[in-house]
Amino acid sequence: SSAINIVNHGIDLKYSKPYLDFGPGFYTTPSYDHAALAAIRTTQKYNAKNNKNEEPYIVEVDYKPISAMDLVIGSYPRHSERWGKFVLNNRLKPQMLSAYNILEHNQDGKYDICYGEIADGNIINIAYKVNGGQVIPEDINYKEFLKDNGEVYPQQYSFHTLKAISCIKVLSCDMINNKKKYLNARGRR
């Protein structure tokens, strides 16, 4: 599993997917429940695609910044237009970033670390429309889809450079035994 690879070989950024909330990187969350659900879902998709029977794991890490490194950190609080634009921009194809002269993204790893709330499905749907040419970024009304319904989304911390990864220490790696507990809580965040 990827968790076992992290424990045995360290974090390798080449395995990151390209169009994530804060750009390609290694993502963590202080929410055990969210991490467990994400691990279960990812493992289920992997098993279905590859006809495997892997088990989901949670890797617990500790982050200790080294002050001499001068890490560039992006902070993006939820329910702000700045957060919405940044997350959307990271989900756009490079040709869209170029066509609309969008510079505020992290697909190039300009930020070593980013943190903020995890996006819901709304931004993914909007990015799909922008990438498909159905919507242009200037026409997006962020207030419309960043409604504050009182729901609190888990925080995420993402690491995008080797410099940032070097500050992470793996503490433990544990198999998730009670998968039903997390799958039954799907509606909750």
Regions found by a protein language model. Name each.
Residues S16, K49-N50:
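Short consensus segments that form the blades of beta-propeller domains
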Residues S1-Y27, D33-Q44:
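Glycine-rich loop/turn
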